[in-house]
């Protein structure tokens, strides 16, 4: 996937952090939940534990002389996932608010803080 050119004004912000619990909204894995293993803000993608898993054939090498197959998670586009509300367990949008001088993420549906 080509990256935006150096001069583009692409928004490199994500609503997700490593460790967040998210749910997949669309596609083959719709409805599955998992923790964010890796956030890729430049590509607007996230890697979710146990979702979008592929089997990769690995050639034998010095570190792995046997070779074989390994399971690996691929990145999903950030628009296909949503944060899980800690109170209801359902997908929610996120709003940022300042609480006690700190900027925190708040679930829109329930008003609970996520951070």
From Swiss-Prot:
**Assigned keywords, A-Z:** Ribonucleoprotein, Ribosomal protein, RNA-binding, rRNA-binding
Intrachain S-S bonds: none
Q: What are the recorded GO MF terms, alphabetically?
A: rRNA binding; structural constituent of ribosome
* A Pfam family matched in the record: ribosomal_L24
Q: Please name the source species.
A: Deinococcus radiodurans (strain ATCC 13939 / DSM 20539 / JCM 16871 / CCUG 27074 / LMG 4051 / NBRC 15346 / NCIMB 9279 / VKM B-1422 / R1)
Q: Does the keyword Transferase apply?
A: no
Q: What does this protein do?
A: One of two assembly initiator proteins, it binds directly to the 5'-end of the 23S rRNA, where it nucleates assembly of the 50S subunit.
Keyword ATP-binding on this protein?
no
Can you supply a Gene Ontology BP term from the record? translation
Taxonomically, the superkingdom here is Bacteria
Q: Which InterPro entries does UniProt cross-reference here?
A: KOW, Rib_uL2_dom2, Ribosomal_uL24, Ribosomal_uL24_CS, Ribosomal_uL24_KOW, Translation_prot_SH3-like_sf
| PROSITE patterns per record | RIBOSOMAL_L24
Protein name in UniProt: Large ribosomal subunit protein uL24
Please describe the quaternary structure of this protein.
Part of the 50S ribosomal subunit. Contacts trigger factor when it is bound to the ribosome.
Q: Name one GO cellular component term.
A: cytosolic large ribosomal subunit
Family, per entry: Belongs to the universal ribosomal protein uL24 family.
């Amino acid at each position: 996937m080509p990256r935006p050119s150096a001069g583009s004004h692409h928004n490199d912000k994500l609503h997700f952090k490593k460790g967040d619990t998210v749910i997949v909204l669309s596609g083959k894995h719709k409805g599955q939940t998992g923790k964010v293993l890796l956030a890729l803000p430049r590509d607007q993608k996230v890697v979710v534990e146990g979702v979008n898993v592929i089997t990769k054939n690995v050639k034998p090498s010095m570190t792995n002389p046997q070779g074989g197959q390994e399971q690996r998670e691929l990145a999903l586009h950030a628009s296909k996932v949503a944060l899980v509300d800690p109170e209801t367990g359902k997908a929610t949008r996120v709003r940022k608010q300042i609480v006690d001088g700190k900027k925190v993420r708040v679930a829109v549906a329930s008003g609970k803080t996520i951070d």
